[in-house]
Amino acid sequence: MATSDSNMLLNYVPVYVMLPLGVVNVDNVFEDPDGLKEQLLQLRAAGVDGVMVDVWWGIIELKGPKQYDWRAYRSLFQLVQECGLTLQAIMSFHQCGGNVGDIVNIPIPQWVLDIGESNHDIFYTNRSGTRNKEYLTVGVDNEPIFHGRTAIEIYSDYMKSFRENMSDFLESGLIIDIEVGLGPAGELRYPSYPQSQGWEFPRIGEFQCYDKYLKADFKAAVARAGHPEWELPDDAGKYNDVPESTGFFKSNGTYVTEKGKFFLTWYSNKLLNHGDQILDEANKAFLGCKVKLAIKVSGIHWWYKVENHAAELTAGYYNLNDRDGYRPIARMLSRHHAILNFTCLEMRDSEQPSDAKSGPQELVQQVLSGGWREDIRVAGENALPRYDATAYNQIILNAKPQGVNNNGPPKLSMFGVTYLRLSDDLLQKSNFNIFKKFVLKMHADQDYCANPQKYNHAITPLKPSAPKIPIEVLLEATKPTLPFPWLPETDMKVDG
């Protein structure tokens, strides 16, 4: 039963729900406002705090450079506001389609794809030369090849246009988070495991740095390091290999050599710098707005329990038993006052196939602990749709790993959790009844609270980013530390 107690309210973790992928369709039409309104009112009645939505670059800037059309999204935002929910807006600079759960297809803008017809190297590329059109390679971040603009300038202009065209919703407090898309599926990573190219879970994936821009960048980096003879990896296997079948990832393979370490540092640093640069632009675009910036980091839990962490390495997370690949990301976010949003909160090790050597529970503990140690806010979401008590209990445990505190704020607490995703299945009666209990337990058995200040979530105007942190200082965060201890199970079970 819900109550209201000021101490218990400090244990309240807000719950958001991801809207359907095609809520604004590929033709920039908000198709079914009446149907969505009915669903949003059900969410509001269930105590849900807000919703998250992808704001697709491929829809908004479809017609040509700087030709933005925000009208359909304005109608959507108006409806969300009328239903009494808050909004997390994702700047989705990636393609929808080709990843787990993608049921609609929204490519990046055609005028960008047209540039890619004559210059294939604007896309991430694997060693055999296959291009991936989901997202522009970090290699073109600062190349002015898009009708005179760089990729970073494109993203920056888009965010500025969003601010100008959504200023009333920013001022009214509807929009509370801007999640900045930084890669495929909106995640800060390389597209190392594309289903569209035949990758199957739980295989290792492939490095994606063989476009001409990243090749040239690596060539310059090895020359500066005094090793001009070093090349990009040629022994890391194919998408569906296992680590031990490759020269790179096998025991004592290339990944532990000086050459391998140099490559992995370069490959992961490119992502760190990419995120840092775009967050600088996001900070300028939304400076003074009452919003938080956020980014998403992918939960690559397969091969976590072996020495080589192969699937994480191909995705750009240089994480090994003796090197923390996630805490430097958290440290980079700290200067932008940004939230780290992590996936796979619902997963338990025992649910994964044994051949995947999977450790979602340990991975979540590592990433969240690293964020908290860097004094940033961490949020999260489930990776796959689940409607069962076991999954909800795992999410609640991760949201409050050391349980609730009856006398004040909990020692550890996530800033928010976004449930993936709104659907007819979720709203089916028995599923929705369990979901309502989940929301109540996330809220520490408290009534829905419309005033975030009461649970220490007051949103203040966005301050300027702090000065750039030198890469050497970011990489000091790779030194491994033990994660915070977690309770064996939550003290706020939905079925307890």
UniProtKB/Swiss-Prot annotation:
Catalytic reactions on record: Hydrolysis of (1->4)-alpha-D-glucosidic linkages in polysaccharides so as to remove successive maltose units from the non-reducing ends of the chains
Gene Ontology molecular function: any one: beta-amylase activity
UniProt-annotated binding residues for substrate: D54, H94, D102, K296, H301, T343, N382, A383, R421
Consequence of substituting T343V: Reduces activity 16-fold
Modified residues (N-acetylalanine): A2
Effect of T343S: Reduces activity 360-fold
Annotated catalytic residues: E187, E381
Enzyme class: hydrolase
Record keywords: Acetylation, Carbohydrate metabolism, Glycosidase, Hydrolase, Polysaccharide degradation
Gene3D superfamilies associated with the record: Glycosidases
EC number: 3.2.1.2
Outcome, altering T343A: Reduces activity 1700-fold
Keyword rRNA-binding recorded: no
Database matches in Pfam families: Glyco_hydro_14 (PF01373)
PROSITE patterns for the chain: BETA_AMYLASE_1 (PS00506), BETA_AMYLASE_2 (PS00679)
Cell membrane as UniProt keyword: no
Any one GO biological process: polysaccharide catabolic process
Cited InterPro entries: Glyco_hydro_14, Glyco_hydro_14_CS, Glyco_hydro_14B_pln, Glycoside_hydrolase_SF
Domain of life where this protein originates: Eukaryota
Similarity comment: family membership: Belongs to the glycosyl hydrolase 14 family.
Subunit structure: Monomer.
Stated name of the protein: Beta-amylase
Source organism of the structure: Glycine max (Soybean)
